[in-house]
Amino acid sequence: MAAVTALGSLPRVAAGQVRVFPPAPPAVSPVEGLIDFHVHSAPDVFGRAIDDDESAALYMARKAEAIVLKNHVVSTAGRAFLLRKHNPGVKAFGGIVLNGAVGGINPDAVQWMWRMQGGYGRLVWFPTFDADNHVKHFKDAPEGVKVVGADGKALPAVREVLKVCAQQKLIVCTGHASPPEALALIEAARDAGCDRIVVTHAEFEVVNMSVEQMKKAASMGAKLEICAMGPLMGPSAHLPWMRHWRQVTYKESAEHVRTVGAEHFILSTDLGQTGNPSQPDGYAMLIAGLMGQGITRDQIKLMGRETAGKLLMG
């Protein structure tokens, strides 16, 4: 019978050496101190992998600074209040998306949203999946909720919403508007006195701003959102519905940051869908991908904490 080899004589993996197993958890969480400006979680009408409490718990464990809850059909201002109440230490914010479920471009809906107990309803997204640009792009319907008229200028109802946003210092997000529509929204928002404006996932197919349009938006004071979901989409995406969206590569996003300037961007995930990475894991993937393309940790902090923090809490 062959002698049994002593365990101590087997070749060992040196401390810190990685072969076919994951490395040890990082000493410092990649998302520590950062803000996720675009979190999807249950309850929802769409499949979500985890709920508000679970999303917050994952981010708290990784020492993130704050999260923004987004839902396409209902306000999340009240959910942010409850999340904070049940999870001391969590900084959660919410808002409202002006889709058909809340009456479209509805100033009253915005008024009631920001009045919700706690005052954590801070964002107003213009239409997303009901946006005229979105439904026409994906051929979902002949027309959707419009934000501009035939003259390319913001509609009167849009201007009424923007007045409320200016009065209450709410963050105006362009939703799934086309680049010309988004620029018209930014112009109208500035005219109304709004100074907190975000171009929602500026790189995604349904928006897909050119570099020159990004520069124009930035020159008007808007911040541009980069989302962790972008690199997961495209023809080879692991989920069928994501194959309808163009992939946004880390290389692309890094080039936008270098060309337009890191000070004009914020970071988000747009994650929470069933089958996708958790929001913190997706955020870590985004950070690693951008840094792999030459973006520095200081630039990550600028986009993921400083700029986003000024919008939310400044």
Question: Each PLM stretch: what is its role?
Answer:
Residues 227, 262-279:
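Short acidic/histidine-rich active-site segments
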Residues 18, 25-26, 52-57, 79-82, ...:
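Histidine/acidic residue-rich metal-binding segments in metalloenzymes
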Residues 1-7, 280-314:
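Mid-to-C-terminal alpha-helical segments outside catalytic/metal-binding sites
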